[in-house]
Amino acid sequence: MNIAKMIDHTLLKPNATKSEIEKLCNEAKEYGFASVCINPCFVDLAYSMLKDTDVKVCTVIGFPLGANTIESKVFEAVDAVKRGATEVDMVLNVSMLKSGDYDYVKKEIEEVVKAVKSYGDIVVKVILETCYLTDEEKVKACQLTREAGADFVKTSTGFGPGGATVEDVKLMRQTVGENFGVKASGCVRTAEDAKAMIEAGANRIGASAGVKIAEEWNKLKMS
């Protein structure tokens, strides 16, 4: 197993600098990560550094609260794609989900999916922010995400009170089935953490510790 190809090398902190993003992109090229996951203002920079590689540019939409309007999420997603992003991680509207307004939740995902996929094979991941949800809400969010035409469910923003757990990843995988993406993010800091998430059903890992995870994995010759 090539662990690097399962990692979205991530830097989303609000005080990230251009030089830190450049370092992130260089590390992604060196290690062969699946993507870099960055804030929207850095998409141009990342694209300029990675356009001749197989490392994807991933950005976040409605981040980190997910409370933006549908229209603003669509605009933000399309703008990112026009600038070179080929993967977008959108935060689900947790308030609407917990209010039981499932039509709204499904519609917002559908609208973003429809808008970005008109530009090509853009991967859409939906961040559930599982730390705020009951198990029943996690299942419903997974079902809505799949029905709406997205490509992945993702556990967390990394900005909430909790991150990915083995139990949540198992539940998400069980709900979406085999032919769908599950991304574990938040609190995945070591190769052992990554291995546990993959064994639970994740096929993508979001982590700011991508280099550490990859080096530990290779050193331990994990499979």
UniProtKB/Swiss-Prot annotation:
Question: Between which residues do disulfide bridges form?
Answer: none
The record's EC number reads: 4.1.2.4
Please name the GO terms of the biological process aspect recorded for this protein, alphabetically. 2-deoxyribose 1-phosphate catabolic process; carbohydrate catabolic process; deoxyribonucleotide catabolic process
Q: What is its main location?
A: cytoplasm
Q: Where in the cell is it found?
A: Cytoplasm
| Gene Ontology MF, one | deoxyribose-phosphate aldolase activity
Provide GO CC annotations from the record: cytoplasm
Under the heading NCBIfam families, the entry gives:
deoC
Q: What does this protein do?
A: Catalyzes a reversible aldol reaction between acetaldehyde and D-glyceraldehyde 3-phosphate to generate 2-deoxy-D-ribose 5-phosphate.
Keywords of this protein's UniProt record, alphabetized? Cytoplasm, Lyase, Schiff base
The keyword Isomerase is annotated on this UniProt entry: no
**What pathway, per the record?**
Carbohydrate degradation; 2-deoxy-D-ribose 1-phosphate degradation; D-glyceraldehyde 3-phosphate and acetaldehyde from 2-deoxy-alpha-D-ribose 1-phosphate: step 2/2
Q: Where is the signal peptide?
A: none
Specify the domain of life of the species encoding this protein.
Bacteria
Protein name stated in the entry? Deoxyribose-phosphate aldolase
Q: Which residues form the active site?
A: 89 (proton donor/acceptor), 154 (schiff-base intermediate with acetaldehyde), 183 (proton donor/acceptor)
Catalyses which reaction(s) = 2-deoxy-D-ribose 5-phosphate = D-glyceraldehyde 3-phosphate + acetaldehyde
Tell me what organism the protein belongs to.
Thermoanaerobacter pseudethanolicus (strain ATCC 33223 / 39E) (Clostridium thermohydrosulfuricum)
Q: Which family does it belong to?
A: Belongs to the DeoC/FbaB aldolase family. DeoC type 1 subfamily.
